Amino acid sequence: MRQLLTVGLVLTITLIAFSALAVETILPLVSDDLGGVSLYGWVFSAFFLGSLASVIVAGGIADRRGTLLPYSVGLSLFALGLLIAGAAPSMPVVVAGRLVQGVGSGAILASTYASIARGYTEAQRPRIFAIISTAWVLPAIVGPAAAAFIAQAFGWRTVFFAVLPFAVLAAALAVPALRRLGAPAHPGEGASRRDAVLVAAGGGLLLAGLSNPNVVVAIALLVAGGAIGVPALRRVTPPGTLAGRGGLGAAVLVRGLITFAFFGTEAFLPLMLREARGLAPTLAGLVLTTGGVSWTSGSWVHERLAPRLTSRTIITTAFALIAIGACGVLAVLLTPIPWEVAYLAWAVSGAGIGFGYAAISVLVLRLAPAGRTGATGAAMQVLDNLGTAFGTGVGGAAVAIAVGRGLAVETGIAAAFVIAIVGAVVGLTVARRLDASRPSVIAEAGTMSAPSLVIDG
């Protein structure tokens, strides 16, 4: 049963990984075809706002009723989102498809964390996390180039449709294993569906406010978003999360900050290389390959070094590497240095997030209260998704504002990179509050290098 479950989960994460890298690669082509560069950031943000709501609901359902239902519904919605985005006649419809896809991805990821916690013993978890981390290797190596080739040869819509058969295969493998896993022996309470919707709605209002050119409307949206989203976010995350207090709260918060910094830069890399340096989609997309491969390498380095390092050292080092890489990418945009430097710089950032993301992932699971593994994993994914949504959304707002004021797209991209670098510095500061009294024991629970979904899905 465990072998079937492992294969099914790995294939599912592989689908999310390929989709994430493919969308980042082909989005400049989609924007050229449909217009709507002002919605560039929303293509990513909508995905993660949808995931925000579903990951909370699915985590609670997994704790109460088992992982089969949230996984099955999540995979179905993920496939539906692919269909909507692939058939979209306009950029707003692409955004809508990505929203549906994100709802599905959130449910899948919450189910995955709960399945690992319940389907494997503590001694087996190092192995399963390491195996799942490899689900990003093949998409990272071939995904961007394959997506660019398919888009140029058959059209960008085919990239979305090509993922669908593999979703059916993943369901055929994972569903029987999840059915055998059954419901948990000691169900937890789960999180409020109302809070899940409020967090996503508040996040959407905040992002809409940041990108609205009308000052009065922008302020109204920001105030409403904060009033709706912040109290709900406090209720669905561990105590002390928003304040970054030590222990579980700080660990969950740095998860959001690390995705803010990393994906707030990565989402605009292909666009930057195309607009500023004139690279073809295939070459521009390859920068994502360097980041993806180095991400996985960083997670394996973490596994080797973690017994000799403290959690504080691991995670602060990760933020430092991400900041260094982002500064290198910014230098490629602002100076005439060779564009190949962007590939090297992004490899540094990829190694950084692999090193730190793995530590945060399993640290949160280890600190989760009994009977709350699904909800705690969901809380981590909430901050993961919120960080990515705001990293890409704020960057997208910078691009939209620049274009709206008649400035070059490159000006908005530069602002997006600077914002992401600031996020990395803040993350480094919060990570210094983590326990530094003893060597990290995170390695005892294994590693995980897969983004949230995304990574970006």
Language-model-derived ranges and their functions:
Residues 25, 48, 52, 58-189, ...:
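Helix-loop-helix hairpins in multi-pass membrane proteins, especially solute transporters
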Residues 32-33, 63-64, 86-89, 118-121, ...:
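Membrane-helix boundary and inter-helical linker elements of multi-pass secondary transporters
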Residues 152-255, 261:
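Hydrophobic transmembrane-helix bundles of small-molecule transporters
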Residues 71-73, 125-137, 186-196, 240-253, ...:
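Cytoplasmic-side transmembrane-helix entry/capping segments in multi-pass membrane proteins
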Residues 1-2, 183-185, 432-457:
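Intrinsic disorder in cytosolic terminal tails and internal cytosolic loops
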Residues 28-31, 116-121, 126, 130, ...:
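Helix-terminus/helix-capping segments at the ends of transmembrane helices and short amphipathic helices
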Residues 2-25, 38-46, 53-57, 68-69, ...:
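12-transmembrane solute porter fold
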Residues 8, 74, 79-81, 97, ...:
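Small-residue hotspots
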